């Protein structure tokens, strides 16, 4: 991979991946097992797990700029959105919906996660939420 052809983040991520490629299958198995165990513990008691989409309000433009180092972006991304990663990698169904606006008028999202294979439950919930509280665009579309 030619460093001149990629943004710093993409180049750093590629190098990190290539350095750790032999560990990736094991890491994915561990994550899937962890999520399976969590799924059994939590989703046996609850239909939906509700978390914020992000841990902070909408950051300024450039907060996750691809011109930053991959290490810095990963640090910021993991602090900014610590809740979505597990579902994204493990395959546990989840969706994020805009549920309101902050004091600056920026969207605030909630993530809804269901048990493994409960995709239909999430879609039904999203439909009900949309019917009860339709999203209004921030700007004229």
Where are these regions (language model features)?
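Short, surface-exposed loop/helix-turn segments at secondary-structure junctions
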Residues: 59-80
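Conserved acidic residues
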Residues: 47-49
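Short helix-loop capping/hinge segments that flank enzyme active sites or metal/cofactor-binding pockets
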Residues: 1-40, 52, 56, 93, ...
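Structured helix-beta-strand junction loops
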Residues: 30, 44-45, 132
């Amino acid at each position: 991979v030619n460093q001149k052809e990629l943004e710093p983040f993409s180049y750093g991520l590629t190098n990190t991946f290539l350095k750790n490629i032999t560990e990736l299958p094991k890491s994915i198995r561990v994550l899937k097992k962890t999520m399976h165990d969590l799924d059994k513990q939590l989703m046996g008691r609850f239909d939906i797990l509700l978390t914020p989409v992000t841990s902070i309000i909408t950051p300024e433009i450039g907060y996750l700029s691809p011109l930053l180092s991959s290490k810095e972006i990963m640090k910021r991304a993991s602090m900014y959105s610590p809740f979505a990663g597990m579902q994204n990698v493990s395959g546990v169904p989840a969706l994020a919906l805009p549920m309101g606006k902050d004091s600056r008028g920026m969207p605030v999202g909630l993530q809804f996660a269901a048990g493994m294979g409960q995709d239909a439950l999430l879609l039904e919930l999203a439909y009900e939420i949309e019917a009860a509280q339709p999203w209004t665009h921030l700007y004229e579309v």
